[in-house]
Amino acid sequence: MKITFLGATRTVTGSCYLLEVGGHKFLVDCGMFQGSKLIKALNEKEFLFHPGEIEAVVLTHAHVDHSGLLPKLVKEGFRGPIYCTKSTEELCSILLPDSAHIQEGEAEYANRKGMRAGKKIVEPLFTVDDAARALHLFKLRSFGEAFNVVPGVTVTFRVAGHILGSAFVEMSVTEGDKKTRLIFTGDIGQPNQPIIEDPAVAGGADFIITESTYGNRIHEAYDKEGELANIINDTVERGGNVIIPAFAVGRTQVLLYYFQKLQAEGKIPEIPIYVDSPMANRATQITMTNPEEYDEEARALYAMQGRRLVSMHNLRFTATVQESMAINEIPGSKIVISASGMADAGRILHHLKHNLWREDSSIVFAGYQAEGTIGRRLIEGIKRIKIMGEDIRVNAKIYNMKGFSAHADKQQLLAWYSSMKEVPKAFFVTHGELDAAMELADSLGRNLGTATYIPHFGDCAEIHGTEWQMHESEMVQVEPAAIDLRAYMRGMEHDYLLQRSKIEQIVARNPDKAVMVRKKLEKLHKYMDDILKDL
């Protein structure tokens, strides 16, 4: 058996694993790269396999960094089944067509500009028709149901507790007289999240392909409901708006659950709450109609409210672009939840444009912000940012509420692995930026006394029973993190030129500041030298 790592290697997005067993090929996940423009460009590269030779896909959950390239896979010849849970299929039915609309729109925009410059016509990465054909291939399997993927390979989905429908994959592989047990974690949720059940206890495996999104972090143990209430109350007192970039699937529904609870307890005022994302609207409806995946508390609330999980008179779902734009014309404080969660596309850009410059407004991030995204730049303290072609000063208060993460942290992952009956032979650490992957790998080695490996793009693990060896990729492939660093440094160069011009203008008006500015720049220069010495 061979496992080739074709995404989420030393980065968080693009999950894709190619498995070869007894002459049969199948994938676990087929995700899209997300982040900066240079990282997104990896989606344009050819697959390192022939899609027509892939016999099946096992899909852990609906998030596009795990499912987003399925339409491209179908476009290029894949015709096999895509196995997933019921809720995952329902969520993909909104996520994949939406992603296809974006691809078509970006291609149309590029072609309008390109025609004037005489450039070659750009084809979309995939189309809405490709997404529809991909969805037609989905085959539903229940949690706990064992099924065959290809000869010799049996898979069972277990509750991952990340988002609705999310699963980790228990896999049994038989080759001749050799048997191997594998676990692909997908994304493991942190315990005690609202609405959905906690991750199930895994039965054990010889090898685990693990995520490491928060492999170097411990979620803060604090009263996040109280903090959310404080932010809302402070913002309302200032007369501003609370703008929340939120993932349409999972995070939006959790936030609504909390707002309902805080309102019922009288801890926040009943100001208008807008969910301004057609995708989030549909995802909320899907969440409402799958109570079998709720935890005990959510089931009780669902029954008490007449088979409705969320019921607030001040909650509004906007559908049209006109309704979305009208929100910013409505006087008074309001809460706006909009996508995308990393603020790099979608209607949220419109709300950021209208609120970032306002000192009375608050921007609340309640999820992971990948390198290169607008969300990441805002939580890192950027003072000016370009949104929708307009240079905007950041005056609003920026909050980064990490406690809402749908990913388990390092301690929670270690506790989950420790609950297994036996220690695996090795962990392959993926789906995390390099520092996170390295820290989790180190902790796994020290705490469990097992081997760990952090694959590069294209690396291949060859496994025979419980024996394994790695074959490092000979491909010339730049790591996504390195691509993103290059883009970030280009941004630094651009900012430096602007800053230099401003400094020269300031000193021209105030020559007495020249000495002070020189001393500060000398300190900065020395700091940069020290950074290079540490590398």
Language-model features: locations:
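Active-site metal-binding loops of divalent metal-dependent hydrolases
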Residues: A8-T9, C30-F33, S87, I163, ...
